[in-house]
Amino acid sequence: MYIANLRLQNFRNIPIKSFDFKNSINFIVGKNGSGKTSILESIYFLSHSRSFRSSQLNRIINHDSDEFIVYTKAYNPDEVVISLSRKKNSNNISKLNSEIQKNHTEITRVLPIQLMNPESFNIINSGAQQRCKVLDWGAFYLDKTFLKIWQQTKFLIKQRNSALKQNYPKAYINGIDKKLCEFADILDYKRQAYFIKLKPKIYEVLSQFNPDLKLDIDYFRGWNSHKSLVQVLEESFDSDNRYNVTNHGPHKADIVLTINHKPIQDIFSRGQQKLLICAIKLAQGEIHNSENENKCIYLIDDITSELDNTHTKTLFSYLKNLKSQVFITTTEENKIIDFLDLDSHIIEI
């Protein structure tokens, strides 16, 4: 997949604008506040039906309007047209090839996105939920049945927590547990299947950034690996009931990053953590591209401020080898001169 044209109308500070892109590395150059990140945000919005910058979606609509529209013409290799619009205090309206979508799942599947921005580098310190999203992104594209299993598991955990808060009888909660454990085991299997592919690829990519960086990468399914979830939920029932929350299960899954059994955030420098996140994101894209004709698109916001010149060069080299379409924002064109080639495309904002 690559985006050939993007049209924005009343999106953030862009009243109306059309952009043409290449199926290569596209550099978006402009001053702070010029709308560079808004272009990345609009592409991300097309894929996910949400923003990576704000949960207040009405704020995305230009203050002089009551609706924004994002439209793109992409190729995979056939032409694909995706549009998304939103009026103030209303819901998003998504269209794929002019057909209104009941949900956004198919568009997300058609338009796979990897985002790398300053907030991405907080994955290591943000808790298990953010790291688990790495697994779920990959499993979603690897296995078409994953989403339904994930949704059903999430529903059952929510139902169980609600039952705990309302002091439902234990027999009722046991009924929920039976269904939950069935779906949790399937979800665990699918996450593990992706993790088995991801782990060696992370090591491979990380070695290209810094061969001296060593760490252990392990998968935690969310409960004791030596016990069934049925047993764990039974043993933890009194505690769960006391605090009105399910403390064990697939919602607690994690990618555990350690050195000598110590969390890497206590050992890795900020710079080393950035390299690890780059390796994770690139590994995900490489796995995706190797198993899908529909290649992953990278959105990279102001990466030159996060990495030094040597590691930025390694990143660009790897991205070129992935043959993914890439969008990179920067405030200073002179910072990217060393990385330009005949296939590069510069858009000045």
From Swiss-Prot:
Signal peptide start and end residues: none
Keywords, comma-separated and alphabetical: ATP-binding, Cytoplasm, DNA damage, DNA repair, DNA replication, DNA-binding, Nucleotide-binding, SOS response
UniProt xrefs under SUPFAM superfamilies: P-loop containing nucleoside triphosphate hydrolases
Domain of life: Bacteria
GO CC annotation terms, alphabetical: cytoplasm
Function: The RecF protein is involved in DNA metabolism; it is required for DNA replication and normal SOS inducibility. RecF binds preferentially to single-stranded, linear DNA. It also seems to bind ATP.
Similarity annotation: Belongs to the RecF family.
The name this protein goes by in its record: DNA replication and repair protein RecF
Organism: Francisella philomiragia subsp. philomiragia (strain ATCC 25017 / CCUG 19701 / FSC 153 / O#319-036)
Lineage: Bacteria, Pseudomonadati, Pseudomonadota, Gammaproteobacteria, Thiotrichales
Gene label: recF
